[in-house]
C-alpha cells in the first residue's frame, strides 16, 4: 500500500497554517465559536484572497495548544440536520442527528490524521475502505467490474450505527493508526487524547443548552474529520471478527462509512454482527453502494425522493443544483424527468450525452473546463 508518512513536525505552527486552507469554510465552527459566527469562514474572517483575521487565527492556535495539552473543555454540539426525513422516521422522532466538534478539535484531528486519510483515499482500489472511490470518468464501471469479478453480490442495510457503534472497534482503529509510518510518541499521546474525547468520555451540548456526559464506549460522532474513514475501518474490522466467530469465509468486502457490500453472508454471521453492535436491518441480493443501485449494470440513484425534496428546500442557484443532479443521473433512465423538471423551472440543462460522457468516459478526466 502506498504510504504517506506522518510528518515529524505534525503539530507545528507552519502545518497548522497550511491546513487552515483545507477547512470547509461553509461548515459550523462548533461550540462555543458559533456564538461569534455561524460558519468557519465567517469566524476566521476569510476573504476571497485567502487571507484571515489574524486575531482569530491566533485565538484558534491558542485553543489548539490547549487541546493538545488536555486543557480544552470540549463540548460536541448536537443538532438535527436540516434535511428531508422519511415520514416513518419523523413520526417516531428518529431524526438525523449531527454531532459536531469544536473548531480547535477539528484542527487537531486534521493535524493528526491528514496524511493517513489521504493515503486511504488514494489506495481505495486496493483496500476494502472505498471512501476514495471516484464514480465519474468511468470510475463506476471499474468499480462495478471489480466487485463482480470478486463475487460481491450482497448489500446490507445497517440500523442506528452511529449511536450503536461499539467502543472496542475504535480502540482497534486507534492501534492501527498508531502503527502508521512516521508516528511519534507525541503523536500517539494526542491520538489517544482525541479518541478518548470522541469515543469514550464525550461531553455533548444540545440546542436547549442541556449538557450530557457519555458514559459508555463507542458512539460515532457524525461531525468528526475522520468519521467516514473510521466508520469504514470499523466495518472492515467487525466483518473480519464476525466471520471468524461464525466460521464464514472472509470472502471479499467493501465499505464506505456504514455502506457495505460483500461476497458471503450466512445467518450465523449476521447473528455475530448483532452481538458485536452492528444491527443489520436487511440483506439485499444486489449491489447498492453509496446511494447507487447497480442492478441494471448502470448507476441508478436510490434517493430520488430525497433529491426532489432537496430541490424544494434549497436556496442555492437552481442552475448549479440541476447541473449536480444532471451528473448524478447522467446514466439514469430518470434523466429525462430531471431535464423536463428543470425546463419547467426555467433552467436549461445540458444534454444527457454530455453528462454521460462526463460520468462514464475516461477521456473526460482530461477536460480542463467542463463549462465549455
Where are these regions (language model features)?
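Viral RNA-dependent RNA polymerase
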Residues: 1-372
Amino acid at each position: 500500500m502506498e504510504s504517506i508518512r506522518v510528518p515529524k513536525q505534525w503539530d507545528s505552527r507552519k502545518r497548522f497554517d497550511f491546513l487552515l486552507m483545507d477547512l470547509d469554510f461553509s461548515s459550523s465552527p462548533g461550540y462555543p465559536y458559533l456564538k461569534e459566527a455561524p460558519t468557519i469562514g465567517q469566524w476566521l474572517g476569510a476573504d476571497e484572497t485567502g487571507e484571515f483575521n489574524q486575531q482569530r487565527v491566533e485565538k484558534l492556535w491558542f485553543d489548539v495548544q490547549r487541546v493538545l495539552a488536555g486543557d480544552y473543555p470540549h463540548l460536541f454540539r448536537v443538532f438535527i440536520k436540516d434535511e428531508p426525513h422519511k415520514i416513518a422516521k419523523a413520526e417516531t422522532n428518529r431524526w438525523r442527528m449531527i454531532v459536531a466538534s469544536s473548531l480547535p478539535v477539528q484542527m487537531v484531528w486534521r493535524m493528526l490524521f491528514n496524511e493517513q486519510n489521504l493515503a486511504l483515499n488514494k489506495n481505495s482500489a486496493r483496500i476494502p475502505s472505498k471512501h476514495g472511490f471516484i464514480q465519474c470518468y468511468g470510475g463506476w464501471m471499474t468499480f462495478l467490474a471489480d466487485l463482480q469479478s470478486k463475487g460481491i453480490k450482497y448489500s446490507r442495510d445497517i440500523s442506528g450505527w452511529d449511536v450503536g457503534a461499539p467502543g472496542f472497534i475504535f480502540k482497534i482503529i486507534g492501534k492501527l493508526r498508531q502503527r502508521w509510518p512516521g508516528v511519534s510518541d507525541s503523536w500517539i499521546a494526542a491520538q489517544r487524547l482525541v479518541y478518548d474525547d470522541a469515543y469514550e468520555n464525550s461531553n455533548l451540548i444540545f440546542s436547549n443548552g442541556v449538557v450530557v456526559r457519555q458514559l459508555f464506549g463507542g458512539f460515532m460522532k457524525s461531525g468528526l474529520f475522520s468519521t467516514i474513514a473510521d466508520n469504514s475501518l470499523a466495518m472492515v474490522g467487525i466483518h473480519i471478527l464476525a466471520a471468524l466467530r461464525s466460521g464464514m469465509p472472509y470472502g471479499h468486502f467493501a465499505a464506505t462509512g456504514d455502506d457495505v457490500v460483500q461476497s458471503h453472508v450466512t445467518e450465523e454471521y449476521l447473528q455475530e454482527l448483532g452481538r458485536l453492535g452492528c444491527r443489520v436491518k436487511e440483506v439485499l441480493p444486489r449491489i447498492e453502494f453509496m446511494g447507487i443501485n447497480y442492478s441494471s449494470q448502470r448507476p441508478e440513484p436510490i434517493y430520488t425522493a430525497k433529491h426532489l425534496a432537496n430541490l424544494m428546500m434549497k436556496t442555492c442557484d437552481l442552475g448549479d443544483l440541476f447541473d449536480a443532479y444532471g451528473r448524478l443521473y447522467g446514466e439514469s433512465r430518470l434523466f429525462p424527468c430531471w431535464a423536463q423538471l428543470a425546463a419547467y423551472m426555467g433552467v436549461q440543462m445540458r444534454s444527457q450525452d454530455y453528462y454521460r460522457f462526463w460520468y462514464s468516459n475516461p477521456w473526460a478526466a482530461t477536460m480542463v473546463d467542463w463549462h465549455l
